[in-house]
Every structure is written in C-alpha cells, then in structure tokens.
Amino acid sequence: MSKKPSAGGKIQWTKMFRKLSPYTIRKGFRYMKHYGPKEFWIRLHERFEPEEVPYGTWYRAYIPTEETLETQRKQKFDYSPLISIAVPAYQTPVEFLRQMIESLIVQTYSNWELCIVNASPDNEEMQKVLAEYSAGDSRVRFCNLKENLGIAENTNRAFAMTKGEFVGLLDHDDLLAPNALYEIVKILQDHPQADALYTDEDKVTTELDEHFQPHLKPDFNLDLLRSNNYICHFFVVRKSIVEKAGGFRKEFDGAQDYDFIFRCTENAGEVLHVPEILYHWRTHKASTADNPASKMYAFEAGKRAIEAHLERTGTKGEVSHTQDLGFYRVKYPVQGKPLVSVIIPNKDEKETLQTCLEMLEKNTGYQNFEIIIVENNSTTDEIFRYYKELSGNRKIHLLRWGKEFNYSAINNFAAAHAKGEYLLFLNNDVKSINPDWLEEMLGVCQRPEVGGVGAKLIYPDNTIQHAGCVIGMGGIAGHMFVDMPADRTGYLHKASLLQDMSAVTAACLLMKKEVFEQTGGFTEELAVAFNDVDLCLKVRKNGYLIVYDPYAKLYHMESKTRGAEDSKEKVRRFQTEIEYMRCHWIDILKKGDPCYNKNLSLTKWNYSLKPIPGMETEAGQKKEKTGRKSCRKYQ
C-alpha cells in the first residue's frame, strides 16, 4: 500500500467558534490544564477538523421517513416479546422527562412498557408529569421512592417493576429513536435465542436542535469492551440474564452500567449488535456526555469494573487509565517463557536486515526467541558475506528458498522448521519503538481465545502505516488510519485502543503455531497480496480472535525490497489474488466486516461516514423532499 496525501490537518474554525460559550471555554481551559498545550492542540484538531461527510447532513438523509415509520407500525411480527424499559429518574427537568416518555409513546413497535422509578419524593412537578402519563397510557408505570437510594439501587427497583421478556436501559434525560424497539424486534426474528442486544447512538444538544458525534459500533468486541464501554446505549438484555447477573451494584456507581454489561455478556449466549442509530444521548452541563470531568469518580469505577470482569473470567491482567478519560489499557503479563520463532524473509538487503536483527538483540526486552532468516534468491556478494558472519549466532538459523518469490510459501516453509510455540512473522524493514513490544504482543497472544496479534506500525515520518485492517476497505481489505499523525488517536480513539479486528498485517504478526497449523498456514495461491488477511480470516473462522495491539509500536518502511506493483505481470497477479479473495470470502465482503460498521466508508481509512445515495449537501433540502426531520421534537 503506497502512502496517500493526508486528508486532515486543518481546523474548521467557523464550527469551533459557533460552539464557543463561557462553559465550553472553561471546559477547554480545564482540559489544557490537565493534559498540557500539546495534547490540547492535538484534541482540538481531532474535534474540529472538517468532516468528510457532515453528520448533520448525513443524519437528515439517514432517518426513516414518516411513511416508513407508518409502515413499521403496521408490521406484524411472528415473535413479539414484551420489552420493558427501565428508567431511574432523579430530579429530572420536567421538559426532559416529558420528551423521554414521548420518545417511547411514538415507538413504531407497540409491545413495550415503561417502568420509571422516581427517586425525587419532594419534586411535585415530576410526580404530576408521571401521574399524567400513567393515566393516559397503561404502558407507562412509575413508582415513587421515599428517598434517593443511589443510581444502582434506583435502577434495581426499576428492574423489579419489569414484566417483559427483555429489559432495556434508558437514562431519564435521553431519547430513543421512534424505530428503536422495532429494529430490536426485527433482528430477533432471525435470532430468537439472543440474550443481549445493543445499538448505535449519537449525542444531541440540550434543546434537541443538533445531532452530533455518532458512535457507530462493531459487533461484539471483547477487547474493545475491555478498553472502553463502547456498548453503553442502547442496551437490551433478556430478563433471565438480568436475574442471573444480579442487577446493578452500588459499589460501581458511576460505571454501574459498564459493570452490568460485563456481567450480562459473560452470562449471555448470543450478543447481537443492531447497526442503527437508535439512541440519542442528551448533552448538558451535568452529563458525562458533555463534561466527562463532572464525574471523575466514574472512571475509577470503570477501571474496577474491568478488574472485576478479569477476575471472574480467570484472566490475568493489569488495568490502567489512558490519557483519555473513560478509556483503559489492559496489560496481559507473559506466562512462563515460551519460545518465539521470528521468521524474516530476506533478499539482498544487508543493511535493512542488519538493522532489524540489531533491534531484536538490543531493543527487545523479551529474549527467548529464535530467528529464522529465509534467504530468497539474493544475488549480491555483500548479503552472503553477512550471512556468513551470522553463522556463529546460535539464535539465528538460515534457510534457503530456491523457488520464485511467494510470500506465503516462504513463510510456510519457515514455519515448518520453527521450534517455537509462537510464530512471529516479521518484515526485515521494521524497527521497534518500545523495547517491550514483543512481551506486549505475547501476553495478549497467550490468552486461550486469541489466535493472532498485530502491532501498530508507523512510517519514519511518524504517521501511521497500520492500525488494523478492515475487510472491504478499498475493495478487498485495507489498513486503517494510514498517514494520520501517530500521536493522534482517531475516531473514538480506535487507533490507540486494544481491540479485535478481522485482520492485521503480517509485517509484524504473532500467532500461536498450533493455530497457524490448524488453519493450514498461508494460502500459497496468494503469493504477494492479501495472504495475511486470508490467514486472519481463517483463524477467526476457527473461533479465535485476531487482536490489534497499539501498545506494540514499530517503525515500518513497508515493502522496501519489493518495489511498486506496476509491471504487467504484477498487475495480472494482483488481479488474480483479488478474484481469489472475492470467491473465498464473499460472505464477509457482502455482509460487511463485523469489526467495522455498515454506515462507515469503505473508501476512507479514517472512519468517515459512508455517503447515503441521493443525500443533499444543503441543509433542509432532504427534509423538504422526504418529510424527514433532522431533530424530532418530543412534546
């Protein structure tokens, strides 16, 4: 993959100034004081760079028309479970309370109940509103507590009110999209045994006049969940799982939902993701959506929730905060001292190989490895003299490949000679940044559910070359965050979070040898392109995880010895490999990468929105043509 011109770098000043207020200015100063000027400037760029596809315009084209909603109301499902919505309410502004309730009343799926626990016994306005709605719609029920018992116990009281087969969690000042429950029940038609579901979400201003910051999620992603409560809203779970998990726990107040989601997913069979924006998280001064620092205690509770999850699952790991509030790092310690076989193909490159070997010797903390160099038809005397110099090193083994270049065959050949329990496929043109890179990757790879681990690779100019691969990107597969400054974290900090991916590059790929052999190794029909993607997909098909690890960082020159793919022969070979991937992985190419999202672009590496056909660029035009409303007004 060749480097592309950077798409970012400029701040959208008009947008930034429009957002300014005394409150946002104070918030900015707090951030700069806490993180420093450099980090503040980086985040300012990320927050206010122009959107490739503006979310406001996109959202107006995305939401269902009134005609579509009416069609949904008439839909009769074979399986129509009662869904109970549990809402703990405390000192809720009555306007917010009304809007939340109205967002349920206008649902296109009607078999629901709303169970509200009012923990504000002295708030007469709230009691009047609740009594009014309860009298007008029997599906709206409420209970007045004598005192505020705290968010966890208030929610448990709401759980106790529920009668439905499924229970959904809704904050007292947030909103559901009118098709939220419809989409939940729709996916249950094909997955009636599912135990838990979650949807995508966005944020909405206090006055409901602007939607922003869409959170477009992957399918269930264990390592991402251990890095951040990405599931968050809207979470719906079978009531039997709620009872088994035990409800909310007050010792995790501030991150009680995070702890609850962990326990539910641990007990659940199938966890489904509904890739639609069905929850609107209202921002205001007191909410963590707008001001994370307003609930600093919540982030410590989140750390403890991860630690408790690791303990329950018997997983050894050390949890720490990252520089971004609410995002965490789990460091998995290496168990024992397993042998790692480092496989490095090489042709002619003496200086490049020498730099790589010196890195392994001097800038790699974990030293229990053997090095297998696969000599591939070199022609220079210099490289053979260097091989002779290496012959005295007992860690290094030289294999000779006499056939034509075939990356897959070369690595399979080396793997057959490897003595290690783990195989590290490593390009000769990489150089480590942090000495614990191999230890970091090995700790992750030793987990029983993990098949392979890929590193974060950075160009010499400190821009990203690889931060995981997305299937379908650019046609077959492509790297994410290419050419983004390495000190940026990207969309929802994904460039800097440990997470499961469908594929990672084999320029630095650690894999259990047993798993490699189970999958049949690299597919030799893929001589140059997509062989690593194909291998990762085979590993995932066998039930193992492929993990992107941003804490293992290396510099990478990328295909320095191969040159450009520009000859007729290379182009023809590349087309053949594309056809192989299309034939063998047609299902995932059609359905979409489960570690990505259907509403994200397959032509942009930076998690941009996928344009909706026919969407207008001028605000309001689509609304007039289709009857869509960009921000629904709830009475």
Residue ranges of predicted features:
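N-proximal low-complexity "stem/linker" segments adjacent to membrane-targeting elements
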Residues: 33-103, 307-362
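Short, acidic, metal-binding catalytic loop of nucleotide-sugar glycosyltransferases
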Residues: 102-111, 190, 358-368
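A conserved acidic beta->alpha catalytic loop
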Residues: 110, 118-128, 147, 373-386, ...
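Glycine-rich, basic loop-to-helix element that forms the pyrophosphate-binding segment
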Residues: 145-162, 183, 401-418
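A recurrent flexible, glycine/aromatic-enriched loop bordering the glycosyltransferase active site
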Residues: 152, 160, 210-240, 408-409, ...
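Short aromatic/hydrophobic "clamp" motif used to bind/position activated sugar donors
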Residues: 167, 423
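Conserved donor NDP-sugar-binding/catalytic core segment of glycosyltransferases
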Residues: 179-212, 430-476
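A short, conserved alpha-helix in the catalytic core of glycosyltransferases
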Residues: 241-244, 251-277, 306, 437-441, ...
